[in-house]
UniProtKB/Swiss-Prot annotation:
Family: Belongs to the NAD-dependent DNA ligase family. LigA subfamily.
Gene designation: ligA
Gene3D superfamilies: 5' to 3' exonuclease, C-terminal subdomain (1.10.150.20), 6.20.10.30, BRCT domain (3.40.50.10190), DNA ligase/mRNA capping enzyme (3.30.470.30), Helix hairpin bin (1.10.287.610), Nucleic acid-binding proteins (2.40.50.140)
A molecular function (GO) term: metal ion binding
Entry EC number(s): 6.5.1.2
Cysteine pairings via disulfide bonds: none
Pfam family, one: DNA_ligase_ZBD
Positions that bind Zn(2+): 401, 404, 419, 424
GO cellular component, one term: cytosol
Protein name according to UniProt: DNA ligase
Source organism superkingdom: Bacteria
Organism, as annotated: Staphylococcus epidermidis (strain ATCC 12228 / FDA PCI 1200)
Catalytic residues identified in the record: 112
UniProt function note: DNA ligase that catalyzes the formation of phosphodiester linkages between 5'-phosphoryl and 3'-hydroxyl groups in double-stranded DNA using NAD as a coenzyme and as the energy source for the reaction. It is essential for DNA replication and repair of damaged DNA.
Length: 665
């Protein structure tokens, strides 16, 4: 057991270090696959030895059991909002008021992150509770969801007791990925990253929150008793040293002119950031001066938030263009008369779905208001009705697919229209583009334009055809010289060696992402083994939900898919997992790797002693009987678990049979 404990401690240290490098320093020293491998190893050990699982284990990052509601908790100190400034005049008045009160002053300027304010409590250096701002006096306990954010340390270097506050946010890249996924699934996308972050942190199921890839910037310490800082800048530096993520774009300035210069700089540069900001926060830097100035009932007197003006422009909606994704979702896009918004020229904007078009009564030919939602995606806010042409008509989505002509359907519970024709050209092309992408088969040089040419020239119809391409097929294509063709054929040949998880992701199975592809590949090791899997078996696996289990089984049972896999195999495309399996604790073959449930009263030992002994033999001891349970050991007065085992046909041992097995070792 001492060896297991040491390994758990080592895994904690490694995973925390790698997480800090990736999510806080943005400078990873190992690939994602190495982190995932170690995390899977720790998950397996904790399942066999739950006594070694702690609240600060890196495994809590993946989420836990769903909650029924969030508990309301009073803040130890109210989370006040900041007063607002909207222009230079407001800022100069603020500065004058400060100087009239305390004389000479130095300011700390910080980016105002557009997210959800949170408060994190640490006791003896461990993260124990996280709350939303709520009404400022009472917030909601979202601790389990906050534990899934890798930028929040679960344990810090020093055994300190304090509360740190900050802003949880969704990076732009995560937001775009999430909305693409929602649209592919026919769901209503989020309007902006702030809404997405807030919605993610209010998920009752922390496993869903974990998938949303949130981050956090910390900006203040509520109780500095155990800190040495005398200024805001020093407090942030101490947080840096403790392993917290603070925003590094902050700047200390000596007067209001420095504040105005900082605002001017970030007004023009904010589009270059990987996250949204909606303004600048200006604070008196000296903490003793902050204390001297104090607070009003609503906000601190020593700080103010400058809000960026919302940039909206008017342009003309020329047309509505439809695109079909690889899952058949039909997405309308506004084609606009080009116009500058927030420093960039905009000629297209997403309209998401027909419901949104009707809700906002947007029509072709309208003069429309455009804004850049969260600095990312241009959004059509509304039509200007008094400029509407007399001949305008209410827009209706087509009843048939614009690519293949198949009838469009709206699946119950979805807002999107979907083409369900498996032979739809637009879907097939999008599927081919997905198959060759970096996270799938990673075929360098096989871009969108070449795929379109190959498809239009009937050289490829499915993903397997890629591996049947020859030099004479490629040379006649536009901009394809001999050297380029040779490199492409080499890349195609190299891709055949990709591990099974890349192939699974590349096939485009609905709901199957990168992470779940890795889980399935590692667990089942070969495509042949996956063909045998059942829906009930998949549901038992962590990270695999009901929808995904059904989707995978339905996909793999399809005879056309079986033929496609065979076609790939005939060209020696790898069908096996090539990664390193997570380590297993060796034990007796009668028990090692088996899922065992103990029920009823044992006479020769306690159930806890039996459980510990089984784990030492490599068994996984669980509390509930499922179809994947291998053995149920039943003592006296065994109840519903025994009945369930009989129903499933699970192997049942009496205590005597169990003792006999023990004695035989």
């Amino acid at each position: 057991m001492q060896d297991v404990k040491k390994r758990v401690e080592k895994l904690h240290d490694l995973l925390n270090q790698y997480s800090y490098e990736y999510y806080v320093q943005d400078n990873p020293s190992v690939p994602d696959s190495e982190y995932d491998k170690l995390l899977h190893e720790l998950i397996e050990i904790e399942e066999k030895y739950p006594e070694f699982k702690s609240t600060d284990s890196p495994t809590v990052r993946v989420g836990g059991e769903a909650q029924s509601s969030f508990e309301k908790v009073n803040h130890d100190t109210p989370m006040l909002s900041l007063g607002n400034a909207f222009n230079e005049e407001d800022l100069r008045k603020f500065d004058q008021r400060i100087r009239d009160s305390i004389g000479k002053v130095e300011y700390m300027c910080e980016l105002k992150i557009d997210g959800l304010a949170v408060s994190l409590k640490y006791e003896n250096g461990r993260f124990v509770q996280g709350l939303t701002r709520g009404d400022g006096t009472t917030g909601e306990d979202i601790t389990e969801n906050l534990r899934t954010i890798h930028a929040i340390p679960l344990k810090i270097k020093e055994p300190l007791n304090f509360e740190v506050r900050g802003e949880a946010y969704m990076p732009r890249r995560s937001f775009i990925h999430l909305n693409n996924e929602k649209e592919q699934n026919g769901e209503q996308p989020f309007a902006n990253p702030r809404n997405a972050a807030a919605g993610s942190l209010r998920q009752l199921d922390s496993k869903l929150a974990a998938k949303r890839k949130l981050s956090v910037f910390l900006y203040s310490v509520n109780d500095l008793t155990e800190f040495n800082a005398t200024t805001q800048s020093e407090a942030l530096e101490e947080l840096d040293q403790l392993g917290f993520k603070t925003n590094q774009e902050r700047e200390r300035v000596s007067d209001i002119e420095g504040v105005l210069n900082y605002i001017e700089k970030w007004t023009s540069k904010r589009g270059s950031l990987s996250y949204d900001i909606d303004g600048i926060v200006i604070k008196v830097n000296d903490l003793s001066q902050q204390e001297e100035m104090g607070y009003t009932q609503k906000s601190p007197r020593w700080a103010i938030a400058y809000k960026f003006p919302a940039e909206e422009v008017i342009t003309k909606l020329l047309d509505i263009e439809l695109s079909i994704g690889r899952t058949g979702v039909v997405t309308p896009t506004a084609i606009l008369e080009p116009v500058k918004v927030a420093g960039t020229t905009v000629s297209r904007a997403s309209l998401h779905n027909e419901d949104l078009i009707h809700e906002r009564d947007i029509r072709i030919g309208d003069s429309v208001v455009i804004k850049k939602a969260g600095d990312i995606i241009p959004e059509v806010v509304k039509s200007i009705l008094d400029r509407r042409p007399n001949e305008s008509e209410i827009y209706h989505m087509p009843t048939h697919c614009p690519s293949c002509g198949h009838e469009l359907v709206r699946i119950e519970g979805e807002v999107a229209l979907r083409c369900i024709n498996p032979k739809c050209q637009a879907q097939l092309i999008e599927g081919l583009i997905h198959f060759v992408s970096r996270q799938a088969m990673n075929i360098d040089g096989l871009g969108t334009k070449i795929i379109h040419q190959l498809y239009e020239n009937q050289l490829i119809k499915d993903v397997a055809d890629i591996f049947y391409l020859k030099e004479e097929d490629l040379l006649p294509l536009e901009r394809m010289g001999k050297k380029k063709v040779d490199n492409l054929l080499l890349a195609i040949e190299k891709s055949k060696e990709q591990s099974l998880e890349h192939l699974l992701f590349g096939l485009g199975i609905r709901h199957l992402g990168v992470k779940a592809s890795q889980v399935l590949a590692e667990r089942y090791e070969t495509m042949d083994q996956l063909f045998k899997v059942t829906e009930s078996e998949l549901i038992e696996i962590q990270d695999i939900g009901d929808k995904l289990a059904q989707s995978v089984v339905t996909y793999l049972e399809n005879s056309d898919i079986r033929s496609l896999i065979e076609k790939l195999s005939n060209k020696n495309v790898n069908m096996s997992y090539k990664g390193i399996k997570t380590t297993e604790i060796e034990g007796h073959p009668d028990f090692s790797g088996k899922t065992i449930v103990l029920t009823g009263k044992l006479e020769q030992m306690t159930r806890n002693e039996a459980s510990e002994w089984l784990k030492m033999q490599g068994a996984k001891v669980t509390s509930s009987v499922t179809k994947s349970t291998d053995i149920v050991i039943a003592g006296a007065d065994a109840g519903s678990k025994l009945a369930k085992a009989e129903k499933y046909g699970t192997e049942i041992w009496t205590e005597a049979a169990f003792i006999e097995k023990q004695n035989g070792i």
